[in-house]
Swiss-Prot record:
PANTHER family: DNA-DIRECTED RNA POLYMERASE I SUBUNIT 2. Gene3D superfamilies: 2.40.50.100, 2.40.50.150, 3.90.1100.10, DNA-directed RNA polymerase, beta subunit, external 1 domain, DNA-directed RNA polymerase, subunit 2, domain 6, RNA polymerase alpha subunit dimerisation domain, RNA polymerase Rpb2, domain 2. HAMAP family: RNApol_bact_RpoB. Its EC number is 2.7.7.6. Belongs to the RNA polymerase beta chain family. The keyword Plastid applies. It catalyses: RNA(n) + a ribonucleoside 5'-triphosphate = RNA(n+1) + diphosphate. One of its GO terms (cellular component) is mitochondrion. This is DNA-directed RNA polymerase subunit beta. In plastids the minimal PEP RNA polymerase catalytic core is composed of four subunits: alpha, beta, beta', and beta''. When a (nuclear-encoded) sigma factor is associated with the core the holoenzyme is formed, which can initiate transcription. It is found in: Plastid, Chloroplast. The lineage of its organism: Eukaryota, Viridiplantae, Streptophyta, Embryophyta, Tracheophyta. It comes from Pinus thunbergii. GO terms for biological process: DNA-templated transcription. It holds the Pfam family RNA_pol_Rpb2_2.
Length: 1075
């Protein structure tokens, strides 16, 4: 998207660019770097040498298409080949060969991966950058301050330096154990003279090393061996004497210094910059000079000569992108490969072997499979709509390995920091436990080389006042100490820029300052927000909490049967649709030769270019992905022109809902508490009808009794359930499936003994002498809510890692879901609600021209939620619909003048009333409101009502997937009460509050039924079914239910005996019985 301003033009970056850049960095740099670090391997006798030449690696072209990998449940990958050399020194024989190391999953054009047929995305992680950070905290008495310096390694491990109240310096090796700094420095190889020669504050250092008023020089003159022994005792909490040995020294080096003191290149750079050191960046481990400089700085902080760090500032954070995560896994795989080659090379001395024989290719494949299958940052891609895919790839997570958890993260970490300005969206985050821990990148932010977040600004020249765009890092001098004007205060009009004051950001504070003192300015009002928030028109009129809900609920909107683009938008809809990859684009200029539903063939300079369309493809969230051609045969197209629209695009613009006529008024209580009543027009005209594609799968395994069989001949099953199967036992294409119908007929072999275990098997064998079947039916049936049309059946046959033949059958069923009571709908401003009733259109309130409204919303949902943007949105929708106009409005239009949004809306309503000759569209007495007529009585409502065309979406929270009922089902073994949940065919548990509600109505018999024979009274529960069939009286329980018996047993386990008594109805005498 290109936006022109007075000073120039700029282009909004591609939304998926961050994922693409990260993966390209891994392929171009990460692979070569790790292969270059792969060591030379020799056997014990040094007769054979093995080496890889990583600079010449090759990635083969994938042998399978991405779409075929999805259908066949395969991984979309490329094969990695690396030249290798083995040398036999005895025979002086040199063998060179290009060896196959394994498979590397490839990123597709959407910035995602296909692993085992499932789309997955790798989420960027935001972590504390490795280095040292100084803070002050109160002691346990909350009186004095303790100054600490925390050294954070590249893997997130922490070591802490601290000055206590007694002014001693300690290094904390664990939560409970600490060691004095002289012992640590002595263990690292320094003596007291070297310490005092290299410190900036020798006097202060000696003063802080005092103990009880006297010098203990022998403590500071400890030998290295003695210091290592003392360090080892403190680290492992060992009492008693130890004997120094090299193995003890190596263990300390491996367990402590290698794990907690590995800084990495980024940590080394941060440490050099913080402590003013000049150590090469390839020195990735902490040195004694680092500890000494850190102690010096800590002393300076103690006496006011240093500055404390803000750990939440983005300059102290880094982004671990997909490149870093994949490179770590590749490093892990090469480490396993090194161990495997060392084991193999021992046996290779006795026989002839090639370099390929020394290498096993399964290690790399298994490592990446484990990463994509189980790593917290490799997530199941949310494909509800294209916006969801874009937003998922742009997430930033504080969670994951080396990060925080939802339970331990503080409020300060979750809060918005001023350094997020232009880099992380202050609105878009998760709701619930992860609020503030999963954020989203701003649309202009990009990730730098060191994992830092950058944001663009226009730099204003002091002399000529000309501007040019620069990217600022968080914490840079320009970002901290220069004044940056905010985008919501700038006008495109040059005259308004010369105003005296403007809001600006300076040193993490927001101030008001003269325009002449501004150094930088924002390039666009949208640059602080994420993609989802940037699609909300009139955003500035909404409370941030409701904007957050609106942004999240746009990602839950399902694709509709006939999508429609919004009348009032922000202008980013086209960019979002383009970058999502849901539309087909012409790659070159040419002429359309042939077009159908599947292929678009164009002629480009005499060559034929074929573009495949996506036809009724299932997404991860069971929504329908589909493309519709938008060009005609013989038409000439240009490069970049849209060839086919997606399921949620119209004319290349993202279209997640429908423009419907809404009225803000109460209606007989049916819109109480955000409920929504709708017209039957939305049902019968398929306004909110959506298609969903569900996949059911069944595996054909090899059992101990033989292979399972797919067949139509299923004994003891009603022929009606098998009516859709073909001769192979698979459901036929185009069949209409109801709940319980067999989709795939399967027989599992079993022994005769297993067959005779069933009662019917023994009965048939005894009475009739019939041979019992040696196979049991194990068919795939349509579950509850699985009705629909079969659109595809795929029988997948592949060989697994163990060499066995694995067969799977996938059945795809298309479901057409109309909107109904219980479905959830939402606008873009957090105005959500559940459908409470579907009214006949003649009963709906109607306009003065006789058009009935489509939805009635509760007006009380606007003032308390402070999302007035929905009112500003629906009024231009009302004006633009008859004039066939669409509005694209950037937020913060108040920068032009006060009440700019109102001054935009009312003139448009006036124009619409003039052009349509309907004066009621704009009534000066109450602009924006209209007189509505009750459809039931024909009377005019007493008060004028706000009506308009609002853009409402149907969300994925649909009643078909949530509602559940059962007449019979399983019970819990212990309590004998119904199980919980739809997936287990559970029932309703009558709990405490339900009992209170029934007691309030005095329904004693219903309450007794609910608590006994319908719940956990076993004997009566079994007798009820027979009583219902025979028409006899319902039996009454005369003993305690099972839950009460369970309570008695639990009390008995606590040595408490509880007896109960039953009073006779005849003589009111107590009849005691054992429970």
């Amino acid at each position: 998207m290109r936006l022109d301003e007075n000073e120039g033009a700029f282009t909004i970056p591609e939304f998926g660019k961050i994922q693409f850049e990260g993966f390209c960095r891994f392929i171009d740099q990460g692979l070569m770097e790790e292969l270059h670090n792969f060591p030379k391997i020799e056997d014990i006798d040094k007769e054979i040498e093995f080496r890889l030449f990583g600079n010449e690696y090759e990635l083969a072209e994938p042998f399978i298409k991405e779409r075929d990998a999805v259908y066949q449940s395969l991984t979309y990958y490329s094969e990695l080949y690396v030249p290798a050399r083995s040398i036999r020194r005895n025979s002086r024989k040199i063998q060179k060969q290009t060896v196959f190391l394994g498979n590397i999953p490839l990123m597709n054009s959407h910035g995602t991966f296909v692993v085992n047929g499932i789309y997955r995305v790798v989420v960027n992680q935001i972590l504390i950058s490795p280095g040292i950070y100084y803070r002050s905290e109160l002691d346990h008495n909350r009186i004095n301050y303790i100054y600490t310096g925390t050294l954070i390694s590249d893997w997130g491990r922490r070591s802490k330096l601290e000055i206590d109240v007694g002014e001693r310096i300690w290094a904390r090796v664990s939560r409970k154990q600490k060691i004095s700094i002289p012992v640590l420095l002595s263990a690292m190889g320094l003596n007291l003279e070297e310490i005092l020669d290299n410190t900036r504050y020798p006097e202060r250092f000696l003063f802080l090393l005092k103990k009880k008023g006297r010098w203990e020089r022998e403590e500071y003159l400890w030998s290295r061996e003695k210091a290592i022994l003392e360090f080892y005792k403190k680290l492992y909490c060992i009492s008693g004497d130890l004997v120094f040995s090299e193995s003890l020294c190596k263990e300390l080096q491996k367990k402590f210094f290698r794990k907690r003191c590995e800084l990495g290149k980024i940590g080394r750079r941060n440490l050099n910059q913080k402590l003013n050191l000049d150590i090469p960046e390839n020195e990735i481990f902490s040195l004694p000079q680092d500890v000494l400089a850190a102690v010096d700085y800590l002393i300076g902080v103690k006496f006011g000569m240093g500055t404390l760090d803000d750990i939440d500032h983005l300059r102290n954070r880094r982004i671990r992108s997909v490149a870093d995560l994949l490179q770590n896994q590749f490093r892990l795989a090469l480490g396993r490969l090194e161990d495997a080659v060392k084991r193999t090379i021992r046996r290779a001395t006795k026989r002839r072997s090639t370099p390929q024989n020394l290498v096993t290719s399964t290690l790399l494949k298994n490592t990446f499979q484990d990463f994509f299958g189980s790593h917290p940052l490799s997530q199941f891609l949310d494909q509800t709509n294209p916006l969801t895919e874009i937003a998922h790839g742009r997430k930033l997570s504080h969670l994951g390995p080396g990060g925080l958890t939802g339970r331990t993260a503080s409020f300060r970490t979750r809060d918005i920091h001023p350094s997020y300005y232009g880099r992380i969206c202050p609105i878009d985050t998760s709701e619930g436990m992860n609020a503030g821990l999963v954020a989203s990148l701003s649309i202009h932010a990009k990730i730098g080389d060191c994992g830092s977040l950058q944001s663009p600004f226009y730099k204003i020249s002091e002399r000529s006042r000309e501007e040019h765009m620069v990217y600022l890092l968080p914490g840079e001098d320009e970002d901290e100490y220069y004044r940056i004007a905010t985008g919501n205060s700038l006008a495109l009009n040059q005259g308004i820029q010369e105003e005296q004051i403007t809001p600006a950001r300076y040193r993490q504070e927001f101030i008001v300052i003269a325009w002449e003192q501004i150094h930088f300015r924002s390039i666009f009002p949208f640059q602080y927000f994420s993609v989802g928030v940037s699609l909300i028109p009139f955003l500035e009129h909404n409370d941030a909490n409701r904007a957050l809900m609106g942004s999240n609920m746009q990602r839950q909107a399902v694709p509709l049967f006939r999508p429609e683009k919004c009348i009032a938008g922000t202008g980013l809809e086209g960019q979002a649709a383009l970058d999502s990859g849901s539309v087909a684009i012409a790659t070159q200029e040419g002429r359309i030769e042939y077009i159908d539903a599947v292929n678009i063939t164009s002629s480009v300079n005499g060559d034929t270019v074929r573009t495949e369309s996506v036809i009724y493809q299932r997404s991860n969230t069971n929504t329908c992905t589909h493309q519709k051609p938008q060009i005609h045969q013989g038409e000439c197209v240009k490069k970049g022109q849209i060839l086919a629209d997606g399921a949620t695009t119209v004319g290349g613009e993202l279209s997640l809902g429908k423009n419907v006529l809404v009225a803000y008024m109460p209606w007989e209580g049916y819109n109480f508490e955000d409920a929504i009543l709708i017209s039957e027009r939305l049902v019968y005209e398929d306004i909110y009808t959506s298609f969903h594609i569900v996949r059911y799968r069944i595996e054909i395994c090899m059992t101990s009794q033989g292979p399972e069989r797919i067949t139509r001949e299923i004994p003891h099953l009603d022929a009606h359930l098998l009516r859709h199967l073909d001769e192979n036992g698979l459901v036929m294409l185009g069949s209409w499936i109801e709940t319980g119908d067999v989709l795939v007929g399967k027989l599992t072999p079993q022994t005769i003994e297993e067959s005779l275990c069933t009662p019917e098997g023994r009965l048939l064998q005894t009475i009739f002498g019939i041979e019992v079947s040696t196979a049991r039916e194990n068919c795939l049936r349509a579950p509850i809510g699985g009705r629909g049309r079969v659109i595809d059946v795929r029988w997948i046959n592949r060989v697994d890692d163990s060499g066995d033949n694995a067969e799977t059958v996938h059945v795809y069923i298309s479901q057409k879901r109309k909107i109904q009571v219980g479905d959830k709908v939402s606008g873009r401003h957090g105005n959500k609600g559940i459908i409470s009733i579907v009214l006949p259109r003649q009963d709906m309130p109607y306009l003065q021209n006789g058009i009935p409204v489509d939805m009635v919303l509760n007006p009380l949902g606007v003032p308390s939620r402070m999302n007035v943007g929905q009112i500003f949105e629906c009024l231009p929708g009302l004006a633009g619909n008859p004039m066939n106009k669409h509005y694209r409005i950037t937020p913060f239009d108040e920068k032009y003048e006060r009440e700019a949004s109102r001054k935009l809306v009312f003139p448009e309503l006036y124009k619409a009333s003039e052009q349509t000759a309907n004066p009621w569209v704009f009534e000066p007495d109450h602009p924006g409101k209209h007189r509505l007529i009750d459809g039931r009585t024909g009377d005019v409502f007493e008060q004028p009502v706000t009506i308009g065309k609002a853009y409402m979406s149907k969300l994925s929270h649909q009643v078909d997937e949530k509602i559940h009922a059962r007449s019979s089902g399983p019970y819990a073994r212990v309590t004998q009460q119904p199980l919980r949940g739809k997936s287990k065919r559970g029932g309703q548990r009558i709990g405490e509050m339900e009992v209170w509600a029934l007691e309030g109505f005095g329904v004693a018999y219903i309450l007794q039924e609910m608590l006994t024979l319908k719940s956990d009274h076993i004997r009566t529960r079994n007798e009820v079914l027979g009583a219902i069939i025979t028409g006899g009286p319902i039996p009454k329980p005369d003993t305690a239910p099972e839950s009460f018996r369970l309570l008695i047993r639990e009390l008995r386990s606590l040595a408490l005996e509880l007896n109960h008594a039953i009073i006779s109805e005849k003589n009111f005498q107590i009849d005691r019985e054992e429970v």
